[in-house]
Amino acid sequence: LQSPQPRVITTSSLMHRHGRINRDDLQLKQSYETQRAYNQTKLANLLFARELQRRATVAGSHLISVAAHPGVALTGIGTNRSRQGLLSLKDKFVGLFLKVLMPLLGQNAEQGAWPLLHAASLEPIEPGGFYGPAGFGEMKGPPKAARVGTVANDQALATWLWETSEKLCWVDYSALGKPPVDKSKKEIIDAV
């Protein structure tokens, strides 16, 4: 991070748009489902990337934080779900969708890496940006700016998640400072 313009790339997913952060059960000890955990994790990743950029900017750092998603990439994600133990009906449906439709709607793993490579190496890049495939539904195609789900724009939620993560991981990133929360943004945190 000491380079003239360090860049942090965080992998998210289209599924972040279905993610919800439950502050009372962040680690899903009471309500674990495979797909729910995946969606929440990918939302948390995007919130983290955007919060890191906000904090780096406030601290006067040249760090650039961006996130990217691979779209629907043909990897083992759809074929290895049965090894995850007891699956809910919803998880089984998602598994069937992945197994049947991924080959039709998706792209190979190499093409899925394009948005992440774009985020990591191309100039100019939007600090705090989010990138994914340009094709139908952002499922495949060359990289472009991706659509950010509503909850991923919640600055209050991002701040809460950042501070909670610091406590859970026993780390302190106070050197980055704490940016003010934009009160003009609708706070969604209590609704999720």
How would you describe each model-predicted region?
Residues 139-142, 185-189:
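Short, solvent-exposed polar/charged micro-motifs at secondary-structure junctions
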Residues 1-91, 167-182, 188-191:
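Rossmann-fold NAD(P)H-dependent dehydrogenase/reductase core
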Residues 41, 92-146, 155-159, 163:
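C-terminal helical subdomain
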Residues 29, 33, 37, 100-101, ...:
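Short amphipathic alpha-helical segments at helix-loop
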Residues 73, 106, 155, 182-183:
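A generic alpha-helix propensity feature with a strong bias for hydrophobic helices
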Residues 125, 151-176, 181:
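Hydrophobic transmembrane alpha-helices of multi-pass solute transporters/permeases
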